[in-house]
Amino acid sequence: MSDMHQMSADEVIAHLDLELLEGEGCWYRLLWNNGSGNAIYGMVTPREFSALHVLAEDELWVHVAGDPVDLLILHPDGSHQQVRLGKGAGQTPSVLVPAGSWQGASVATGWGLFVCALAPAFTGFALATPEHDFTAWAQVSGRIKELIRG
């Protein structure tokens, strides 16, 4: 198949040689890492979503193909953003997640492929658990629960 948009999730995973990221849960493949920054392909499906996690680095998300990706960003000041990453009307093709902000993403149907670029380079992440205190973001508590594994 020459058009990635016509592929199934399994076909995209095989075509791009993606691996399941343990814990966080999305499909990924490292594209570039030079010590100053790095980039990955990431892909979510209804079953394999990006669980709520926090990074020490700024992360730029850019939609590449497939269905829109619903991204939740919880900022340290108690504010939040709900972003629909995609190419259609009412969607945004890219969004920056500032360092120290909790983030998680899912897709309602199909699959969504994106690139995430970090600067400085990735050093690790903390994964949310049901025991984490997210009361500062009570207005999106239902969405937070959807994005926590366990």
Give a label for each model feature:
Residues 2-96, 104, 111-112, 120-124, ...:
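Non-catalytic, conserved peripheral segments adjacent to functional cores
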